[in-house]
């Protein structure tokens, strides 16, 4: 379930936002996606719709994790999985990279501020020595 959520979030939220951020407004680029975020009303409506989708998706995951007795400190218990790392990557991309300031602006800050369980899991993943050494400041230095 958790890997699926991350894949869904990446495909339907992050990837279409990336098109907006990079200015890939040509139909060629948008046709490569599973959905065409800009087809129904341009950039502003696309951002509004993707913001709503982000909220719905993150609230669904937060509710599922908060109601799970096994989601501590990681999504499925005491061991960090690939899904935890994928979640960490998705969340930190939104929270720290320059381009996703578009989404942060829609929330007046952190788009995951109402998701304490997701935040806790990401903190745990980030505290893993190998993750911290590998990631360093890459998210905050990334322009997109």
Question: Positions of the model-derived regions?
Answer:
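GST-like fold's C-terminal all-alpha helical module
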Residues: 3-123
């Amino acid at each position: 379930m958790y890997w699926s959520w991350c894949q869904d979030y990446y495909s339907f939220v992050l990837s279409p936002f990336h098109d907006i951020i990079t200015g890939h407004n040509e139909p060629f680029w948008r046709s490569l996606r599973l959905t065409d975020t800009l087809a129904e009303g341009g950039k502003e409506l696309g951002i509004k719709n993707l913001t709503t989708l982000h909220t719905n998706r993150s609230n669904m995951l937060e509710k599922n994790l908060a109601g799970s007795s096994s989601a501590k400190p990681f999504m499925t218990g005491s061991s960090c999985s690939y899904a935890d790392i994928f979640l960490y990557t998705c969340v930190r991309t939104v929270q720290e990279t320059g381009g996703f300031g578009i989404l942060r602006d829609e929330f007046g800050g952190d788009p995951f501020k109402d998701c304490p369980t997701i935040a806790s899991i990401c903190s745990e993943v980030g505290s893993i020595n190998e993750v911290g050494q590998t990631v360093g400041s890459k998210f905050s230095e990334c322009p997109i």
